[in-house]
Amino acid sequence: MRKKVVSPAQRRAFAREVVNQELCSQRGACRILGLARSTFNYHGRPPTPAEEQLRKRLLELSTEHPRYGYRRIAALLRREGWRVGKRHIQRLRRDEGLRVPPTKRKIVRRGVSTGLPTTATHRNHVWTWDFIADATVRGGALKLLTILDEYTRECHVLWAERALKSADVLHWLQKAVEQHGAPEYLRSDNGSEFIAKIVQRWLKTNRIKTIYIEPGSPWQNGFVESFHGRFRDECLNREQLWTLTEARVVVGDFRRKYNEVRPHSRLGYESPAMFAARSCPFPAPVGLRPPSTGNGQRNNENINSNKCLD
């Protein structure tokens, strides 16, 4: 019979329980628990009708606002005209067994980086990928996948869907690698699509190292965040997208102009395609090993894929 006894009221209740079970005398129980016999024999005065009404209202407010602590509950009661202090309310809540349950911390899944944080020094050195969200005029969700080369700033993939799963992002990554060659490193956040086992197996098979940024640190993926800022400012905020098909056409046209026409200040005001052609001749695409599972492989290519890839 082991209990954690802290307050005098708890010690008194425990001592009475021991005495009622005839396990010990009253004097012995008080001596063992460090409780005065006057405290053992103390019986509080019965609650007044006003006290009963206060307790009833306290329970009502605590049920209505389960995340409010004793300070806010006391403030609400004083607003209603009750003359109470916060310590009084704290004691009443404790007597009633009321408390604000602690917030459960969310388990943050994190990918395991297989490469060190690296700054791109040549084409296909570091790629980065991420999502950006938008909506159609009627409120339909749009989720867009972006894949960039951090050195040339070329946008290899910009694809819109209602929802994108790990098999979908792997499909578009495969197509980008088949056309542009494989990167040495792939940078991303810890999104569930990017740390999925099917993606991890494929990257390991094709010897592509991963660089996962710290949770809640988008600045560590600054290239794609900068691109998304330009994309939203120059395209998404200016266009009214009514359907998914229209969204694919619009973002495909933006990707083409971004790669081939738009001057980029970091590239000496050349377009990414011009910079890539001048400074780094196109490498021969490397051969790919098949994925370790068939879940991420698609047999039929989407008819609109030519608007997503170069």
Question: Which residues does each predicted region cover?
Answer:
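Charged, often Cys/His-bearing segments associated with DNA-binding zinc-finger transcription factors
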Residues: K3-I32, G287-D310
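Basic, flexible linker segments flanking DNA-binding modules
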Residues: K4-A13, C30, L35-V126, S217, ...
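Residue-level signal for the short linker/turn that defines the boundary of a DNA-recognition helix
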Residues: L23-S25, Y68, V84, W242
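Mobile genetic element proteins and their domesticated derivatives, centered on retroelements
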Residues: A29-C30, F40, L58, I73, ...
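Short small-residue beta-strand/loop micro-motif enriched in glycine and branched aliphatics
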Residues: T39-Y42, E154-L158, T210-I213, N237
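RNase H-like two-metal-ion nuclease catalytic core shared by retroviral integrases
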Residues: P49, S188-S192, A196-R201, T210-D233, ...
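Mobile-element integrase/transposase regions
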Residues: R83-L148, E154, S166-K175, Q179-E184, ...
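C-terminal domain-tail junction helix/linker
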Residues: N206-I208, G229-D310
